[in-house]
């Protein structure tokens, strides 16, 4: 499997989540020192992660805005330390070009933009400048849709075209339907059912639903975040069967056997 100029063995891969934030919904405050972050990265690599997704700002509902300066202070030391110690691809989870540039300079390989270039109009130019693969995620302000799966497909197709127009090569573009972002539980469920339509848009698809509210709802409610890892793994299997190629998860080990087996059947 290729992500731009990068090659990953197999037809599917796990992206391990590393939140260096104090307020992420699942693991906020757990990895706010470089050493704690490195220890977690080492474990995720041992468990089978092929990409580490580093984020310095929580995107949970109601989270506080973080300036680019503060975000850079959080992520750059961690990215540098990962690059110095491990041979692993790193993605930077940010929608700010200033942070993205600093992360690329520090050693990040991939851009993961939860606003698909809408927040910062220079993100696509930056991706083109660095020949960096970019993941474009569906997002919007309100939970209002004509038909959620079609609307998400239209959005992702339009944002991918905007990236192409800005000089990003097609093989550097990945898409993410954005589970949990501006979507009700019912809308997330409908989008899950229509996931194959997203996978038919002509771009590789990242699947990120780990520990989110819709997983809790599918389990009947009242579960803690870490109690959703088994269901997350089940949904990873479902997504790979629909055509997704990367699953973004907190618990790498719980997903590794699923990815290892299904990768051989894809």
Swiss-Prot record:
Q: Name one GO cellular component term.
A: cytosol
Keyword check for Magnesium? yes
Q: Where is Mg(2+) annotated to bind?
A: 19
Chemical reaction(s) catalysed:
(7,8-dihydropterin-6-yl)methyl diphosphate + 4-aminobenzoate = 7,8-dihydropteroate + diphosphate
Annotated residues for binding of (7,8-dihydropterin-6-yl)methyl diphosphate: 59, 93, 112, 176, 212, 248-250
User: What InterPro entries does the record tag this protein with?
Assistant: DHP_synth-like, DHP_synth_dom, Dihydropteroate_synth-like_sf, Pterin-binding_dom
Cofactor(s) needed for function: Mg(2+)
Question: Where's the Pterin-binding domain?
Answer: 12-260
Instruction: Name the enzyme's class.
Output: transferase
Organism domain of life? Bacteria
What are its GO biological-process terms? folic acid biosynthetic process; tetrahydrofolate biosynthetic process
Q: Which Pfam families match?
A: Pterin_bind
Which keywords fit this entry according to its UniProt record?
Folate biosynthesis, Magnesium, Metal-binding, Transferase
E.C. designation(s)? 2.5.1.15
Pathway field of the UniProt record reads: Cofactor biosynthesis; tetrahydrofolate biosynthesis; 7,8-dihydrofolate from 2-amino-4-hydroxy-6-hydroxymethyl-7,8-dihydropteridine diphosphate and 4-aminobenzoate: step 1/2
Q: Partners and quaternary state?
A: Homodimer or homotrimer.
PANTHER family the UniProt entry points to: FOLATE SYNTHESIS PROTEINS, FOLIC ACID SYNTHESIS PROTEIN FOL1
Chain's role: Catalyzes the condensation of para-aminobenzoate (pABA) with 6-hydroxymethyl-7,8-dihydropterin diphosphate (DHPt-PP) to form 7,8-dihydropteroate (H2Pte), the immediate precursor of folate derivatives.
Q: Family, per the entry?
A: Belongs to the DHPS family.
User: What protein does this entry describe?
Assistant: Dihydropteroate synthase
Task: Give the organism's phylogenetic lineage.
Answer: Bacteria, Bacillati, Bacillota, Bacilli, Lactobacillales
- The gene is folP
């Amino acid at each position: 499997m290729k992500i731009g100029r990068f090659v990953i063995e197999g037809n599917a891969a796990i992206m391990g989540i590393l939140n260096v934030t104090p307020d992420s919904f699942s693991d906020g405050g757990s990895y706010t020192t470089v050493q704690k972050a490195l220890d977690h990265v080492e474990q995720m690599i041992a468990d089978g992660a092929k990409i580490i997704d580093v984020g310095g700002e929580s995107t949970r509902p109601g989270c506080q805005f973080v300036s680019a300066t503060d975000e850079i202070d959080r992520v750059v030391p961690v990215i540098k330390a990962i690059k110095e110690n491990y041979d692993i691809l790193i993605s930077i989870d940010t929608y700010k070009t200033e942070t993205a540039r600093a992360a690329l300079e520090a050693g990040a390989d991939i851009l993961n933009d939860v606003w698909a270039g809408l927040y910062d109009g220079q993100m696509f130019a930056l991706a083109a400048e660095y020949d960096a693969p970019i993941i474009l995620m569906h997002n919007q302000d309100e939970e209002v849709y004509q038909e959620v799966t079609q609307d998400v497909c239209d959005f992702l197709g339009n944002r991918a075209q905007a990236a192409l127009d800005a000089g990003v090569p097609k093989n550097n573009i990945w898409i993410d339907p954005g589970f949990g972002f501006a979507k009700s539980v019912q809308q997330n469920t409908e989008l899950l059912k229509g996931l194959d339509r997203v996978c038919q848009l002509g771009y590789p698809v990242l699947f990120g639903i780990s520990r989110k509210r819709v997983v809790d709802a599918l389990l009947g409610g009242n579960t803690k975040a870490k109690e959703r890892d088994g269901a997350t793994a089940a949904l990873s299997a479902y997504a790979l069967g629909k055509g997704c190629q990367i699953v973004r998860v907190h618990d790498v080990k719980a997903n590794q056997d699923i990815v290892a087996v299904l990768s051989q059947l894809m």
